[in-house]
Amino acid sequence: MTIPATRLDQIANRFAELEARMASGTLEGEEFVQASRDYAELEPVAKVAAEVKAMREEIGGLEEMLADPEMKAMAQEELAAIREALPEKERQLAIAMLPKDSADNKPAMLEIRAGTGGDEAALFAGDLYRMYERFAGEQGWKVEPVSMNASEVGGFKEIVANVSGTGVFAKLKFESGVHRVQRVPETESGGRIHTSAATVAVLPEPDEVDVQIDDKDLKIDIYRASGAGGQHVNTTDSAVRITHLPTGIVVQQQDERSQHKNKAKAMQVLRTRLYDHLREQSQGEEAAARKAMVGSGDRSERIRTYNFPQGRVTDHRIGLTLHKLDEIIAGPGLGELVGALIAEDEAKRLAALSE
């Protein structure tokens, strides 16, 4: 994709303008915050745009040198090398210029729920949580559990955690969907392979200004927290259930002994789910953009299979199979899958632009 020279100049001028504003020392408050965001977003684009412009100018200079018999051989060699490298650099620029998802730099709410497969599904949900926890550690992110429903055999029936850091949602958003595991359970004496599943949802966490919640739209119920088998785990009414009446979204929280802490956590989850609901509505109005994404974005879509006997992980959306199951489930190896999904998404969006 060839970017016009006028567009390169526009990028350079806009970046120079932002640099001057940032250096002026006159920006304060929200104006400074917005300018900083604009600068951080434009900087990588401006860097690649400058490289493309320099390569094009160098091609022009080398073409003039072809008229000089003494310089012709050297100029031809350098010209061939730059002409070969330029299309890839222009592709990098086109990717850098793709419209950004406004949520990409937001923290995320990670929700993992055991699906079909009983105890084995709960154990797998635990494996997935630890995989994301270790991957997050490698990225320098922070993971804080918000609520959990542990299984009696280990793992989780459900766990919700907050993941914060740089570029969290951008890297984790393609993890939403049904993850399937094929392995022999430890309790299986006959050595038969069982298939079970867990559902992962990754939701961007909104800023306060992104979602406004009116108290009159909420129905709040307070009740006594209960544990496995229905026994009460607290002698006071500390569990909280919040229903958002306009959307019907219901959030329950009972992990903390304090009603106030449970309410605060429930509101955090509600705000995130409401923001996700609003994003889905707007994406529904932008069907073409959504169609260009990797996969359907539907959280009921089976996206990945982890086959333990064969030591392989297959991502069904991009047809990628990696025989690195141990490395992936341990956390560090997940980066290769994440990178492949991001690259495929960029390629699809580039193709959609050129149609």
From Swiss-Prot:
Against SMART domains, the record matches this protein to: PCRF (SM00937)
Major location (coarse): cytoplasm
List where in the cell it is found: Cytoplasm
Q: How is it modified after translation?
A: Methylated by PrmC. Methylation increases the termination efficiency of RF1.
Positions where N5-methylglutamine occurs in the chain = Q231
Pfam families the record matches:
PCRF (PF03462), RF-1 (PF00472)
**One function term, GO molecular function aspect:** translation release factor activity, codon specific
In which family does this protein belong, per the annotation? Belongs to the prokaryotic/mitochondrial release factor family.
PANTHER family, per this entry? LD18447P
What's this protein's name?
Peptide chain release factor 1
